[in-house]
From Swiss-Prot:
Family matches, as InterPro entries: 3-IsopropMal_deHydase_ssu, Aconitase/3IPM_dehydase_swvl, AconitaseA/IPMdHydase_ssu_swvl, IPMI_Swivel, LeuD
Biological function: Catalyzes the isomerization between 2-isopropylmalate and 3-isopropylmalate, via the formation of 2-isopropylmaleate.
Catalytic activities: (2R,3S)-3-isopropylmalate = (2S)-2-isopropylmalate
Involved pathway(s): Amino-acid biosynthesis; L-leucine biosynthesis; L-leucine from 3-methyl-2-oxobutanoate: step 2/4
SUPFAM superfamilies for the chain: LeuD/IlvD-like
Subunit structure: Heterodimer of LeuC and LeuD.
Main EC class the enzyme belongs to: lyase
Swiss-Prot/TrEMBL keywords: Amino-acid biosynthesis, Branched-chain amino acid biosynthesis, Leucine biosynthesis, Lyase
Protein name: 3-isopropylmalate dehydratase small subunit
Record EC number: 4.2.1.33
Length: 204
C-alpha cells in the first residue's frame, strides 16, 4: 500500500444517494480474488447501454470526467453487502478518494484497509460541491490527510474526520497486518517480560 499524504486531482460527481455495493460492482464480478481488472465492472449497469456500448449520459463517461481521481457522491455511499470488491473496483478504476456526506460502515472500513480514502463532509458542503462541479466540470480538489482538510476551489478549507489508527496506516502506507509486523519486537519483548504460567496437572 502506497503512503498517502495529499491527494490532488480532478473530481467527478455522481449525485445519487444510497448507492449500494451491488450498484458499485454487480455480484457476477465477485468470483475473482485478484483486484486487477475489476474496473471493468464498476457501475456496470449504469456505465453501459443494453447493447454494451458506453452510456454517454453517465457522469463517468463524459469527456470532462477523464482522469478523475476523486469521486463525489451522495449520502450512505457503499450500503448493502460487505463485498470488499466494491472499494477494489473504485481503486482499480483510478479513484484515490470518495467524498460523501456519509458512508456505510463496512464499506468505509474496507476502503481504509486498501488505501482508498473515504472523506465524510457535511451535507451542506456536499451540496456546494455539486453546484461547483456543475459550474466547472474541470474542478480540482486537494485533500490533505495529515491536516484532515479538503481545500475547496473558493479557498475555504473543510475538516473531515478519520480515526487515528487508520490515519497512521494511510500516512505510512501500511495495512493492519503491516502495522502488526512493525510491532513484532515490542510484542516479543512483552511476552518475554510476562511469561505464561506453567500448566501443571494436580494428581488426586
Amino acid at each position: 500500500m502506497e503512503p498517502i499524504s495529499t491527494i490532488t486531482g480532478k473530481v467527478v460527481v455522481l449525485p445519487v444517494e444510497n448507492i449500494d455495493t451491488d450498484q458499485i460492482i454487480p455480484a457476477r464480478f465477485l468470483k475473482v480474488t485478484d483486484k486487477s481488472g475489476l474496473a471493468a465492472g464498476l457501475f456496470e449497469a449504469w456505465r453501459y447501454l443494453p447493447d454494451g456500448t458506453l452510456n454517454p449520459d453517465f457522469p463517468l463517461n463524459r469527456p470532462e470526467a477523464a482522469g478523475a481521481t476523486i469521486l463525489i457522491s451522495g449520502r450512505n455511499f457503499g450500503c448493502g453487502s460487505s463485498r470488499e470488491h466494491a472499494p477494489w473496483a473504485l481503486q482499480d478504476y483510478g479513484f484515490q478518494a470518495v467524498i460523501a456526506p456519509s458512508f456505510a460502515d463496512i464499506f468505509r472500513n474496507n476502503a481504509l484497509k486498501i488505501g482508498l480514502l473515504p472523506v465524510m463532509v457535511e451535507q451542506s458542503v456536499y451540496d456546494e460541491l455539486v453546484v461547483m462541479y456543475a459550474n466547472d466540470p474541470s474542478m480540482v480538489l486537494t485533500i490533505d490527510l495529515a491536516a484532515q482538510i479538503v481545500a475547496l476551489p473558493d479557498g475555504r478549507q473543510v475538516h473531515f474526520p478519520i480515526d487515528a489508527f487508520s490515519k497512521y496506516c494511510l500516512l505510512h502506507g501500511v495495512d493492519q497486518l503491516g502495522f502488526l509486523l512493525q510491532q513484532e519486537a515490542a510484542i516479543a519483548a512483552y511476552e518475554a517480560a510476562h511469561p505464561q504460567p506453567v500448566q501443571t496437572t494436580v494428581r488426586r
